[in-house]
Amino acid sequence: DFSDEIINSLSRNGVVNGEMIAEAAMKFDKNHENPLLMPYYENGSRSDNPYVNFYWDYCAQGKAAYAEVNFISLQEAINIIEESGGIPILAHPGNNIKENINLLEQIISCGIKGIEVYSSYHSKEQVEFYKKFSLKHKLLLTCGSDFHGKTKPSIVIGGTDCEGIEDKIISQLKCYC
């Protein structure tokens, strides 16, 4: 049970996502007893990042509440980032691409300029893999926690170690611009 009013108050420009639906549903006290939502409340098995976990459990591709989204191509995204003065960086590849070298090479052939080597999602082995891959392909190395505020409360800003090379990363990013 939840209201359109709550969902609309959480959305920007009428755009609604699965995390917002989870937050709206969890605001109602009577939903605390709903067996579908119980894992997302405090001390539940999915409570570490409840809104994002709800999204992956119910709204992701192949799940009951999935709605198809038409995304722009990678090339279009890279062009928009560069036209806006940004640097196209591949974020936390260990979370979705893993160590698929063929896919990584396809992605960099589109014009990606760097890889988020240091990520809250990466194991030490993945950090080493992406560091070697990035250096081999002369890509920028970056670091990110993937902090998203209330949607990922278990992740904190600055909570990702980048082996003491913060200044080098920042310097290289500044030189690129």
Task: Enumerate the language-model features and the residues they cover.
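Extended substrate/RNA-proximal surfaces in nucleic-acid metabolism proteins
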Residues: 1-97, 101
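Charged catalytic cores and adjacent phosphate/nucleic-acid-binding surfaces used
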Residues: 76-86, 90, 94-177
